[in-house]
């Protein structure tokens, strides 16, 4: 990237921007951090792995539900104040997970983690959109999506080894990140905010509706992959915990490495064309991961999905946050809410289908991005005009 291009992607001078990107790490990390240590949590809290696995859903459903309104509420209460209080509450939630004496208390603490993160992630997207000049917004949101991918990559790499000693140690890392961000908060606005309540009716627009649909479909497929790929790695190829952790980390690592290029492509191609390409890549990656006859092809499929999801996160965030100027945080939180509703629903749909139909049930996850291709292609062609 040239110096000029790099400068365009940076926020305006005089702002503290790095916490915006570090904050993007927390949501994806926290959502999946229990997955690699489900068995250890089950043993520690005297329950079954199936019950302990509900820790993912009990995080995602409150996270998604609260994000329906969290961005708009934060615009009303003040972004900076909301961000700082939410980070402190997240630290408290991590402590509750560590101290939980039973699975019921643990799941309640996971739900609290989800609620607190619902007041951080959309505010970060809104702040980046405000602070970065429009010409470099794709690159900035691409970097943010890369940090989200880093959170997904780090989750199994931290949780897995922590669980070898004591699964409760895994919660120290995200709590420490939240403490740093609370002490050194990011700049949240580019200047004085409009007075009065943020416009809720402005959220009823076509671009935001499409962003919500693409966001839902993306995570509905991708979270299905994160669960089914681990099941397939163990059942079909006999991979152990460390090997499965490395496989799962490949999803986030691939997205992190591809993020700068994806941001530049978004700036060059626009969101709708990028949405078509990323959904096609997502569909191909899902089929390869589901039906590939070797561990290598399974890993390549997981990596391709990781790249596609990072590209779609960037695309959806750009569409949503620019759809409603007077309520950016509300728009961003609404799109993110649909994303995590898709993620929360995914295991409930795809795991039984995989159990019933095997590889074909896994490959069925590709139907979701194919619908996304249709939505994005229709919008792209309608905006391209006659040739």
Name these PLM-found stretches:
Residues 134-186:
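Helix-loop-helix hairpin linking two adjacent transmembrane segments in secondary transporters
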Residues 89, 93, 104-113, 296-304:
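Paired small-residue
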Residues 323-357:
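A late C-terminal transmembrane helix in Major Facilitator Superfamily
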